[in-house]
C-alpha cells in the first residue's frame, strides 16, 4: 500500500539553505555561517552520499531477500478474475470432454469401441464351446450303435509301401492268406461312429457336486443284470450292467446315491483320466422330456459312481429309473485270463457276479523256429485333459526265439498315414525298453509294471539303436536276440479327429544262415463304449397329472447340450456429474508462520480425483503455523467467488524454503486453484502479491491452464526448479495464468489425476503487499492432486515480520515564518540562530520529538537512511562564532543609533 509522503525527499533538500528576511544583517549572518562552516558542509554532503548509497544497496538487498516491493492497489483485479473464471468454465467443459475421449480409446471397460467388440469375442468363445460340446455329443449319440460281434479279420502288411526298404523291409511275396494265418490277429467289427472321436479333448470333469445327503438308504436297486459274463478284453470285449432303481420318500437337489465296482472291473476301460482329476463324466439320467433327473460321474481311483439328484426331484415323489453302464477289465488287477469276482454294490446293496476274461494271447507270431513274433495293445488314451497322449505296450519276441538281425518298427498309423491321428517322432514319443527275465510271467492283459522285478530296464543300451528316419515310424535295432523284451510307448496323437490306429512290425532272419527272412505285424485301434440311463417321478404338487417313468432301454439316449447363450455385455456405469461446491468461502486466513523447512516428502498419493479434501498425507515437518483454515474441501468445482479484499501488508518473512511445487497460482488470494497442494506446508500461498517471478522451470506437465493473471508483483525469484513431472492429468483447467516464474525444483512426480474443474472466480482484490519471503524449502514431493479451489484468502501473515507499519505520515507543515520583526530595542544578544530550522521540523513526525521516525517496514527504513545530512559540526569554531556575534552586535548598534537619530529628527 502506498504511503503518503508530504515532505520533500532528502535528495531534494540536501544542499538547500534556509533564507529569512531579517533585514540587511541577514546577508552578513549568512555569509558568516557560509565561511565559518563551509568545509563541514562538504564533509556532511560527502557523508550523506555514502549513507544514501548504502541505504540504496541495503534496500536492494532487502528487495532481493523479501521478493516483494510496494505496489499500488490493483482495482481491476476483480474484473480480471471474473473474466478468467468465465473462461475457466468453458475450458472445463472442453477439458472434461478430452479425458473422456482418451479413456474411451484406452480403457476397455468404458470405451464404446471395446464394448462393441466384446460381443464378438464372446460369440467366438461361445461358438468354440458349442463346437466342443457338439464333438463330445456325437460319440455319445453313437453309443447304442456298437456292434459287439467279434470276427477274425486279416490285416494285410504286404501293402505297406511306405516302409519298403531293400535292406530292412524286403517283404516276401506271400499271399494275404499266408500273412493272415501267420498274423493270427482278430479285429473287432464296429460301426465307424462307435470309435471315439479324437477331434477335441473332453472337458475336464470334477466329481459330481454332492452337496446334499447320501440317500443310499432311500434308493432300492433291482433287476440287476450283466449283458454278458465272458469276453476278450484284448479284442475290444466288454459288458454292460443294467439295473432299475426306485426312491422311497422325498429327496432334494444335491442328495445322491452311489454304486461301487470290484477290483477286477473298471468303468473307464482303456481311457486314461489320470490327468483329469481322475474323474470320468457319465451320461445324465434323464426323463422322456429330456429333463435331467440326476447327474453322474465315475471316480477312477475308488471305482465309485455318484448319482446326484437335480432340482427336478424337489417337488417329485415315487422317483424311479434305470441305468445301463459299460464295464471293462482292470488290466492291472486281472492280468491273466480267468474268472474273477464281480460283486457290484448299488446303493449299499450287493449284487454278486462272476466275470470270465478270455484274453487273446499276446504271444503271437510266425509259427516256425526263426519266425518273427510281436504283439501290442493300446492300454490308455487321454481324451479329456487336452494333452492328447496314449500309452501302448509292445511285446517283442514273446516266444523267446533265437533271432538274427532283428528290427522292430513302431508306427503311428496302419495302412496310410493320413488315416490315423497317431504321431510318432523323436519329440512326440518316449520309449522305455525292458528285458524280461521269465516270459511265462508276462501278463495276458498287456499290463507291465516298470517296477516289476521280472522286468529289467535296458533303455540306455538302445540309445544309439533307436531312429526315426521314416515318417511317423520309430525303428529299433535289436540285432541278434534270444530274449523277450517289453517296450512301453508314451506317444501323442493330433487333433484331426481321426481314429488312433497303430501298428508294430518285427522282421528278422535265421542267425545261423543269415537267411530265411521273417516278418510279422500287429494292428491296434481304440474303441470306446458309452452308457447312460433314464428316470422319472410322480409330481408331488399335482397328483392329478402323474408322469410315470417310461421303461429304460439298455442303450441310453444322448443328453443334448443346451445352446450356450452369450453373456450380455454390461452397460458401462457413467461417472456422476460433479456437483459444484456452493461458494466454498474457504477462508484460509493462513497465518503462514511458515519458517517451514517443510521437507514435505508428502507422498501425498493423492491420485485424488480432486475430491481434494486435500488430506494430502503430507508428512511435511513443516511447522507452518499456517492457520490456513483451508480444509480445502475444495470439491474442486468450487465456484469460489472469493471477493477477498485481503489488504495483507504482511511482511511475511516466511523463510519457508518452499520448493513450492506450488503451482504458485500467484496473485495468490487468487482462489488459488493453486494445485499447490504443494505439500510444502510452507503455506507459501502467501497472498504473495507475487509478481512471483518464481522461475517455475516447473516441468509441471500439469495441464493447469491456471490463467491467474496474477499480477503477483512478488519479485519472488523462488528458484524452485520444479521438475514436477506431474503426470498429473491434472485436468486442472484452472485458468491460473500464473506469471509465476516459480522455478519449483520440486521433483513432484505427481501422477495426480486431479480433474480440477475449479471454476475459481477469484475476485480476489488481494492487495497483498505481502513481503512474503517464502523461501519455503518444502520439498513437496506432493503428489497432492488437490485441485483445491480453496478460496484460500490466505492472508499469509507468514511469520509476518511486519515491522511497524506505522503510517507515520509526518505531515509536519511547520511553516515557521517567524517574522521576528524584533523592533525590540532590546539589545537582544539573541543568538537567534533561527534554529527554527524548518528542515529539521519537517523531518520530525509531530508525535516524535526525538526525530526517530518509525514508519512501516518499507517506508521507515528508507526515510531513516535518507534523512537530511547534518549541515554543521557540533564542535563549532568559537572564533567564527565570536566574530559573527561581534559583527551582529556592531550592526545592531549602528542600526540602533541610526533609528535613534531618525527618531530625534522626527521629534
Swiss-Prot record:
Compositional bias of kind Pro residues: 545-555
Sequence positions bearing Pentaglycyl murein peptidoglycan amidated threonine: 871
Motif (LPXTG sorting signal): 868-872
Biological process according to GO: cell adhesion
UniProt motif MIDAS-like motif: location: 272-276
Keyword list, A-Z: Cell wall, Peptidoglycan-anchor, Secreted, Signal, Virulence
Signal peptide: 1-44
Intracellular or extracellular location(s): Secreted, Cell wall
Compositional bias of kind Acidic residues: 556-831
Biased composition (Low complexity): 102-119
Propeptide: 872-907
Domain of life of the organism encoding this protein: Bacteria
Region (Ligand binding A region): 45-542
Region annotation (Disordered) ranges: 44-191, 530-879
Sites marked Cleavage: 197-200
UniProt entry tagged with the keyword Nuclease: no
One Pfam family, short name: Gram_pos_anchor
Residue ranges, compositional bias (Polar residues): 44-61, 68-101, 134-189, 835-846
Topology of the protein relative to the lipid bilayer: Peptidoglycan-anchor
Compositionally biased spans, kind Basic and acidic residues: 863-876
Domain remarks in the Swiss-Prot or TrEMBL record: The Asp/Ser-rich domain functions as a stalk to allow the ligand binding domain to be displayed in a functional form on the cell surface.
PANTHER family membership: TOL-PAL SYSTEM PROTEIN TOLA (PTHR34403:SF8)
Role according to the record: Cell surface-associated protein implicated in virulence by promoting bacterial attachment to both alpha- and beta-chains of human fibrinogen and inducing the formation of bacterial clumps.
Membership in a protein family: Belongs to the serine-aspartate repeat-containing protein (SDr) family.
Protein name stated in the entry: Clumping factor B
Species of the source: Staphylococcus aureus (strain MW2)
Amino acid at each position: 500500500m502506498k504511503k503518503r509522503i508530504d515532505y520533500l525527499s532528502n535528495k531534494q533538500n540536501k544542499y538547500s539553505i534556509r533564507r529569512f528576511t531579517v533585514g540587511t544583517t541577514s546577508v552578513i549572518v549568512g555569509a558568516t555561517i557560509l565561511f565559518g562552516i563551509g568545509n563541514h558542509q562538504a564533509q556532511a554532503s560527502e557523508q550523506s552520499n555514502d549513507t544514501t548509497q548504502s541505504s540504496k544497496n541495503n534496500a536492494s538487498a532487502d528487495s532481493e531477500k523479501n521478493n516483494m516491493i510496494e505496489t499500488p492497489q490493483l482495482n481491476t483485479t476483480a474484473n480480471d478474475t471474473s473474466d478468467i473464471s468465465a473462461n475457466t468454465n468453458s475450458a472445463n467443459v472442453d477439458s472434461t470432454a478430452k479425458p473422456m475421449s482418451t479413456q474411451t480409446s484406452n480403457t476397455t471397460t468404458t470405451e464404446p469401441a471395446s464394448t462393441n467388440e466384446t460381443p464378438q469375442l464372446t460369440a467366438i468363445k461361445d461358438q468354440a464351446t458349442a463346437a466342443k460340446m457338439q464333438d463330445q455329443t456325437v460319440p455319445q449319440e453313437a453309443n447304442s450303435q456298437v456292434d459287439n460281434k467279434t470276427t477274425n479279420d486279416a490285416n494285410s502288411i504286404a501293402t505297406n509301401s511306405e516302409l519298403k526298404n531293400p535292406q530292412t523291409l524286403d517283404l516276401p511275396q506271400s499271399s494275404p492268406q499266408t500273412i493272415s494265418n501267420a498274423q493270427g490277429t482278430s479285429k473287432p467289427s464296429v460301426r465307424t461312429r462307435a470309435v471315439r472321436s479324437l477331434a477335441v479333448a473332453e472337458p475336464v470333469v470334477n466329481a459330481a457336486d454332492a452337496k446334499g445327503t447320501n440317500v443310499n438308504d432311500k434308493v432300492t436297486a433291482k433287476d440287476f443284470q450283466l449283458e454278458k459274463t465272458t469276453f476278450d478284453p484284448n479284442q475290444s470285449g466288454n459288458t454292460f450292467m443294467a439295473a432299475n432303481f426306485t426312491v422311497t420318500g422325498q429327496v432334494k437337489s444335491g442328495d445322491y446315491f452311489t454304486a461301487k465296482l470290484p477290483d477286477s472291473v473298471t468303468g473307464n476301460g482303456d481311457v486314461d483320466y489320470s490327468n483329469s482329476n481322475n474323474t470320468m463324466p457319465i451320461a445324465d439320467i434323464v426323463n422322456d422330456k429330456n429333463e435331467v433327473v440326476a447327474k453322474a460321474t465315475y471316480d477312477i481311483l475308488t471305482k465309485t459312481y455318484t448319482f446326484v439328484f437335480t432340482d427336478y426331484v424337489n417337488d417329485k415323489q415315487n422317483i424311479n429309473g434305470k441305468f445301463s453302464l459299460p464295464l471293462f477289465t482292470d488290466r492291472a488287477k486281472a492280468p491273466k485270463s480267468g474268472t474273477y469276482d464281480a460283486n457290484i454294490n448299488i446303493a449299499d446293496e450287493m449284487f454278486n457276479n462272476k466275470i470270465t476274461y478270455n484274453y487273446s494271447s499276446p504271444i503271437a507270431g510266425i509259427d516256425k523256429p526263426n519266425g518273427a513274433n510281436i504283439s501290442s495293445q493300446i492300454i490308455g488314451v487321454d481324451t479329456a485333459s487336452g494333452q492328447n497322449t496314449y500309452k501302448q505296450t509292445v511285446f517283442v519276441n514273446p516266444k523267446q526265439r533265437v533271432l538274427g538281425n532283428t528290427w522292430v518298427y513302431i508306427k503311428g498309423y496302419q495302412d496310410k498315414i493320413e488315416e490315423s491321428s497317431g504321431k510318432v517322432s523323436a519329440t512326440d514319443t518316449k520309449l522305455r525298453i525292458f528285458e524280461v527275465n521269465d516270459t511265462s510271467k508276462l501278463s495276458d492283459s498287456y499290463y507291465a509294471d516298470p517296477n516289476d522285478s521280472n522286468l529289467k530296464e535296458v533303455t540306455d543300451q538302445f540309445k544309439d539303436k533307436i531312429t526315426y528316419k521314416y515318417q511317423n515310424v520309430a525303428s529299433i535295432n535289436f540285432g541278434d536276440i534270444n530274449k523277450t523284451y517289453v517296450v512301453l510307448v508314451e506317444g501323442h496323437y493330433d487333433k484331426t479327429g481321426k481314429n488312433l490306429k497303430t501298428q508294430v512290425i518285427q522282421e528278422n532272419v535265421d542267425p545261423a544262415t543269415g537267411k530265411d527272412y521273417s516278418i510279422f505285424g500287429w494292428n491296434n485301434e481304440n474303441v470306446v463304449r458309452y452308457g447312460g440311463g433314464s428316470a422319472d417321478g410322480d409330481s408331488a404338487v399335482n397328483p392329478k397329472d402323474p408322469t410315470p417313468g417310461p421303461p429304460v432301454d439298455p442303450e441310453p439316449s444322448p443328453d443334448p447340450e443346451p445352446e450356450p447363450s452369450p453373456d450380455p455385455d454390461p452397460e458401462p456405469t457413467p461417472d456422476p456429474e460433479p456437483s459444484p461446491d456452493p461458494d466454498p468461502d474457504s477462508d484460509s486466513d493462513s497465518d503462514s508462520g511458515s519458517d517451514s523447512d517443510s521437507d514435505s516428502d508428502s507422498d501425498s498419493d493423492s491420485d485424488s480425483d480432486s475430491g481434494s479434501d486435500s488430506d494430502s498425507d503430507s508428512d511435511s515437518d513443516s511447522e507452518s503455523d499456517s492457520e490456513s483454515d483451508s480444509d480445502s474441501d475444495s470439491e474442486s468445482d468450487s465456484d469460489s467467488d472469493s471477493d477477498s479484499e485481503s489488504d495483507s501488508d504482511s511482511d511475511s518473512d516466511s523463510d519457508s524454503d518452499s520448493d513450492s511445487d506450488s503451482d504458485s497460482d500467484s496473485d495468490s488470494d487468487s482462489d488459488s486453484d493453486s494445485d499447490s497442494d504443494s505439500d510444502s506446508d510452507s503455506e507459501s500461498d502467501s497472498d504473495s502479491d507475487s509478481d512471483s517471478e518464481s522461475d517455475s522451470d516447473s516441468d509441471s506437465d500439469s495441464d493447469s491452464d491456471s490463467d491467474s493473471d496474477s499480477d503477483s508483483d512478488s519479485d519472488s525469484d523462488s528458484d524452485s526448479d520444479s521438475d514436477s513431472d506431474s503426470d498429473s492429468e491434472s485436468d486442472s483447467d484452472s485458468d491460473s495464468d500464473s506469471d509465476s516464474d516459480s522455478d519449483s525444483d520440486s521433483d513432484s512426480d505427481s501422477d495426480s489425476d486431479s480433474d480440477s474443474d475449479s471454476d475459481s472466480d477469484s475476485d480476489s482484490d488481494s492487495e497483498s503487499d505481502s513481503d512474503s519471503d517464502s523461501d519455503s524449502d518444502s520439498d513437496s514431493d506432493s503428489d497432492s492432486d488437490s485441485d483445491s479451489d480453496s478460496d484460500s484468502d490466505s492472508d499469509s501473515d507468514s511469520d509476518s515480520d511486519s515491522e511497524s507499519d506505522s503510517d507515520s505520515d509526518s505531515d509536519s507543515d511547520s511553516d515557521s515564518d517567524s517574522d521576528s520583526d524584533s523592533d525590540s530595542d532590546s539589545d537582544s544578544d539573541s543568538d537567534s540562530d533561527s534554529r527554527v530550522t524548518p528542515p529539521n521540523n519537517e523531518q520530525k513526525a509531530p508525535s516524535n520529538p526525538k526525530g526517530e521516525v518509525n514508519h512501516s517496514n518499507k517506508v521507515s527504513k528508507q526515510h531513516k537512511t535518507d534523512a537530511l545530512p547534518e549541515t554543521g559540526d557540533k564542535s563549532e569554531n568559537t572564533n567564527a562564532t565570536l566574530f559573527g556575534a561581534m559583527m551582529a552586535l556592531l550592526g545592531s548598534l549602528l542600526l540602533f543609533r541610526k533609528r535613534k537619530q531618525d527618531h530625534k529628527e522626527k521629534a
